[in-house]
Amino acid sequence: MKSLQALFGGTFDPVHYGHLKPVETLANLIGLTRVTIIPNNVPPHRPQPEANSVQRKHMLELAIADKPLFTLDERELKRNAPSYTAQTLKEWRQEQWPDVPLAFIIGQDSLLTFPTWYEYETILDNAHLIVCRRPGYPLEMAQPQYQQWLEDHLTHNPEDLHLQPAGKIYLAETPWFNISATIIRERLQNGESCEDLLPEPVLTYINQQGLYR
């Protein structure tokens, strides 16, 4: 049986414990040995990042330097066009054997807007979705047809993610940290401490670069 590969995308502006710790817990829960972080260059669904792509890449490298679970993939940073998950997953699938299990990790907030993503209906053709639950968000989709789509693909057994190459949605009971990049940027702008929110080497780099001031 080929091992499950997991991808974790985002802007990471900056990377923080709210990104890393839930995924580390997830890896222990469902048996992941490697998670590939894919930072995007031009996010299509949100405002453009304050730190440039080189700075965000370097912050990620600092954050995962002592974490063998994580590796970094730069393909989306090299695109000047918007970074679409559907496109990236198609590329990954073409690079792998067809029967290699592949999963894409998202937060529960992203699941609720998932039907607005570019070519969202193709994503489950190439990967599973692993959803990290977050308090305060509803468990149901806004429209009945999307709720039916969720139920058609939902599994409560993480072993299914290892046995099939794609097509399942798994809601993972991961811890939630009340941390966001927005909170960190606001605290830095106000001169407040962020030592408990992100790895020390990342904070040192932010201060050296004068970011988020």
Swiss-Prot record:
Protein function: Catalyzes the reversible adenylation of nicotinate mononucleotide (NaMN) to nicotinic acid adenine dinucleotide (NaAD).
Biological processes per GO annotation: NAD biosynthetic process
Record keywords, A-Z: ATP-binding, NAD, Nucleotide-binding, Nucleotidyltransferase, Pyridine nucleotide biosynthesis, Transferase
GO molecular function per UniProt: ATP binding; nicotinate-nucleotide adenylyltransferase activity
Top EC class for this record: transferase
UniProt similarity note: Belongs to the NadD family.
Pathway: Cofactor biosynthesis; NAD(+) biosynthesis; deamido-NAD(+) from nicotinate D-ribonucleotide: step 1/1
Name of protein: Probable nicotinate-nucleotide adenylyltransferase
The protein's Enzyme Commission number: 2.7.7.18
Domain of life per record: Bacteria
Pfam families registered for this protein in UniProt: CTP_transf_like
InterPro entries noted in UniProt: Cyt_trans-like, NadD/NMNAT, Rossmann-like_a/b/a_fold
Cystine pairings recorded for this chain: none
